[in-house]
């Protein structure tokens, strides 16, 4: 059965330290192409997870929705979908970072490290360090979004790094179709995490991208999710 998002409110949540501006650029074009209505709530770094859940609840008041996001946003959306099977049309998961407890997942380690440096050294020095070790496009993205979320940014990073995502056993109970986009060369969001999500869920597909592709055009990430969803038809 084809998953039809035409006219469907689609709530997409940002990754840790990222924001709704990036979600807009990554997903608005691909979603518009299939007639979906994008809702991209801004992160609330002082209450990151609760803010995401509140946005999902509010959007679902008027009927079933599609949900998803990037990294931690994808994990929160998947957890919400598991808890609300009757209100979830589909799950669009871009760059999932881990399943279950974060443990030593690279994204969790990176968020903890960044939070510790922000607390110790401040925003300017930590941003300079980040820029030196990141691709230029990502450095520019995070410089903008980190500044907007300061001074609560370390709180958001620590909350995300401690988040227990749906486990593979839990994803096996996902009623909604799951479309995953994973990068083949992202050390922070390993391809294996996306493969694990897709292997666990009953109805799921994955498409891959490269960091260079999404750096050149953020919409490549959203397009990969929508292509994966179309494969489920």
Which residue ranges define each predicted feature?
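Conserved HGGG/HGGXW glycine-rich cap/lid loop of the alpha/beta-hydrolase fold
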Residues: 1-46
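Conserved acidic catalytic loop of the alpha/beta-hydrolase fold
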Residues: 47-65
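Gly/Ala-rich beta-loop-alpha elbow adjacent to hydrolase catalytic centers
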Residues: 69-77
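Helix-rich cap/lid subdomain of alpha/beta-hydrolase
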Residues: 95-144
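Hydrophobic, aromatic-rich cap/lid helix
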Residues: 140-168
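Short beta-strand/loop motif that positions the catalytic acidic residue
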Residues: 174, 180-182
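Conserved alpha/beta-hydrolase "acid-adjacent" motif
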Residues: 187-193
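Catalytic active-site module of serine/aspartate enzymes centered on a nucleophile-bearing elbow/loop
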Residues: 203-233
């Amino acid at each position: 059965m084809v998953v039809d998002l035409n006219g469907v409110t689609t709530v997409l949540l940002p990754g840790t330290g990222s924001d709704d501006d990036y979600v807009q650029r990554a997903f608005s074009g691909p979603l518009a192409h299939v007639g979906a209505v994008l809702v991209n709530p801004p992160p609330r770094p002082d209450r990151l997870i609760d803010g995401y859940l509140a946005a999902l609840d509010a959007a679902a008041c008027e009927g079933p929705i599609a949900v998803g996001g990037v990294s931690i946003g994808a994990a929160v959306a998947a957890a919400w979908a598991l808890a609300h099977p009757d209100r979830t049309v589909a799950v669009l998961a871009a760059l999932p970072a881990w399943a279950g407890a974060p443990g030593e997942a690279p994204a969790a380690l990176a968020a903890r490290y960044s939070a510790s440096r922000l607390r110790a050294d401040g925003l300017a020095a930590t941003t300079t360090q980040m820029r030196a070790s990141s691709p230029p496009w990502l450095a520019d993205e995070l410089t903008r979004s980190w500044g907007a979320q300061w001074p609560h940014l370390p709180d958001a990073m620590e909350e995300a790094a401690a988040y227990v995502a749906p486990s593979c056993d839990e994803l096996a109970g996902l009623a909604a179709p799951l479309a995953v986009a994973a990068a083949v060369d992202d050390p922070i969001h390993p391809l294996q995490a996306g493969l694990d999500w897709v292997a666990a869920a009953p109805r799921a597909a994955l498409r891959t991208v490269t960091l260079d592709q999404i750096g050149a055009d953020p919409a490549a990430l959203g397009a990969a999710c929508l292509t994966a969803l179309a494969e489920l038809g």
